[in-house]
């Protein structure tokens, strides 16, 4: 009797997992806003979720597929050193790239009919975005705030790269880097 019950429970668990993984992301529970998860180790190989996100952005919005990884020997703390940050190559000096960036941000931060905000960004496990002297962080509900790199005294003395004017930086949670949030699970299942 116990063996039969164990088999039934195992079968039910497998069936539930298959059903959940085949649901579109919209049918899965919406993730909460990501908390800040800074780099704590160094494993710079590009994580599957980071690669998926980068390809999705470039395929849908154009622009260039910039770096994901950064060497462990590079200074400072960076999610690039854990393979969970993507730099989307754009130029803030061109209206075309500013429009591309605005289109992505609008899509990521769109409000659902039921009032839930930032749905796609939350499903993708985005921790924060830095672009064109501004930062949008999940832990501040993606509110647009001025950004100045700690390596710069002023914007005038700061390079385009440190100001994130030649790329959009997108950092992911560890789960998202592993492609283990609802957006990735739904895409992998289809």
Please tell me what each predicted stretch does.
Residues 28-137, 171-172:
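Secreted/periplasmic proteins that engage bacterial cell-wall peptidoglycan
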